[in-house]
Amino acid sequence: MCQAGEDYAGPAQREPPPVPRPSREQKCVKCAEGLPVVVIRAGDAFCRDCFKAFYVHKFRAMLGKNRVIFPGEKVLLSWSGGPSSSSMVWQVLEGLSQDSAKRLRFVPGVIYVDEGAACGQSLEDRVKTLAEVKRILGNTGFPFHVVALEEVFSLPPSVLRRASQEPAGTEEAYKAAVDSFLQQQHVLGTEACASPAQGQGQLRPSHSQEPSGTVGHPKDAQTEALSRLFKSIKTLTAKEELLQTLRTHLTVHVARSHGYRKVMTGESCTRLAIKLMTNLAMGRGAFLAWDTGFSDERHGDVVLVRPMRDHTLKEVAFYNRLFGVPSVFTPAIDTKAPEKASIHRLMEAFILKLQTLFPSTVSTVYRTSEKLVKAPREGCATGPSGPNCLLCMCALDVDNADSATAFGAQSSSHLSQMLTAEAGTPTRPCCGAGEGQTQSCHRAVGRREDAWACIIEQLCYSCRVNMKDLPSLDPLPPYVLTEAQLRSQRGSVSEEIQEYLIEEEEEEDRAEPCEAMKQEAEDKGIGL
């Protein structure tokens, strides 16, 4: 029987058991001698030296297992000032030191993109942040490039074109490059012994030979244009995606301009697990292998690599704390945003809360991403000759003829909106009575709709959804609009000349009668 005042609430959720702290009797799980100072997982307590060896080995193993970076290559380190990218720069700095057992063999540089205008920072705060950034990067000894995000308004349209890529090196080619590099270092070492004054400068990485690129104050017009662009976007999800896209375009442009073949990013295992779930929710499932894999070759001549993808955020925080890795705090575009403000924030809260209850959540999602293979869909055009998304540069793997897909439904919706707009257009002129002004507003509206359709048809499904939150194309950087127009013109010219080209089947059909006539003439003894 039910009783008044009876509490029918469910049982209260139990909080996860606290992580056991290392006691005085507990020893390091690696050396079994030192006192543990860090507990990564339950039962995995490391002393200071063993934790450092464990952390460094992860970084070196990720680079050595993939063998994407060849000796002597110029590598650009994308540094945001956060914990993961700061730890990555620190690992490279220690790997190039003379005390390292196995020295890294590439030539590094660092890039920092100032995103203060997009995040709403004041000019005074940006100046203070840049001063701290230059101080930290100056202590590394690497050539660094500090650029403002406003410079995207002066980028060339070639940034959105996939450059020609050399074929991937084989195992033998990598070994040959290592042997050649070691011989070169041996020759330099011999010369250094003969003339120590001259050889001492040659043994060290030539960081001072390339001038460091620093940013001045960006133009007020560009700062205002960038602020207007991000203020016009309705949702935080679209803002974060556009910010990431513009940052990547600017980084790739700087890498190409200064001869860098690889770009290192500091995305950790935890961040990649969140990114995988976020991209799935945003309709980017076809590009997960590129967005979360070790290497990303979508730009062709510049390859993005993620050497920190095996480190969790917890390990990164412990390492930076124990060994004093410097970093710079800069507010992001989603700072102080509520949990449900964007898909990124929602997925981040979901993964991190699940990780507190089930400590294997991040590793499980991460291991799933490792199994993804960069195999395009059957019948999909890929590579330099195939169409790529105008913004994210991924292959357009959508099927325009399949109306059952979400992409087809989106295209049908866009077409119906255009037909509705045309049906509602008044027949009489509305812009003055002059001959030259008749129906000028309708022509302007038609041009805007044509430009919008030109942009939309060159985007993947995820970028199309995000572009819905942009009410107008006017705030976009000029290089995006210019490249969209050039692609549309090239497509129109290709369609016009297509009917004059002889296809392979027609050429074979024409070749068969010629071969038959030639064979018949040979049988009759007549030479053709």
Swiss-Prot record:
InterPro entries assigned to the protein according to its UniProt record, in alphabetical order: CTU2, Rossmann-like_a/b/a_fold
One GO cellular component, as annotated: cytosol
Alphabetical list of Pfam families matching this protein: CTU2
Residue(s) carrying Phosphoserine: S416
Domain of life: Eukaryota
Signal sequence interval, chain numbering: none
Protein location: Cytoplasm
Keywords, sorted A to Z: Acetylation, Cytoplasm, Phosphoprotein, tRNA processing
Residues the record lists as N-acetylcysteine modifications: C2
Basic and acidic residues bias (residue ranges): 511-528
Annotated segments matching region Disordered: 1-23, 196-219, 504-528
Record GO biological process: protein urmylation; tRNA thio-modification; tRNA wobble position uridine thiolation; tRNA wobble uridine modification
Polar residues: bias regions: 197-212
Pathway stated in the Swiss-Prot or TrEMBL entry: tRNA modification; 5-methoxycarbonylmethyl-2-thiouridine-tRNA biosynthesis
GO molecular function terms attached to this record: nucleotidyltransferase activity; sulfurtransferase activity; tRNA binding
Oligomer status and interactors: Component of a complex at least composed of URM1, CTU2/NCS2 and CTU1/ATPBD3.
Function recorded in the entry: Plays a central role in 2-thiolation of mcm(5)S(2)U at tRNA wobble positions of tRNA(Lys), tRNA(Glu) and tRNA(Gln). May act by forming a heterodimer with CTU1/ATPBD3 that ligates sulfur from thiocarboxylated URM1 onto the uridine of tRNAs at wobble position.
Family in the record: Belongs to the CTU2/NCS2 family.
Protein name per the record: Cytoplasmic tRNA 2-thiolation protein 2
Taxonomic lineage of the native organism: Eukaryota, Metazoa, Chordata, Craniata, Vertebrata
Gene that encodes it: Ctu2
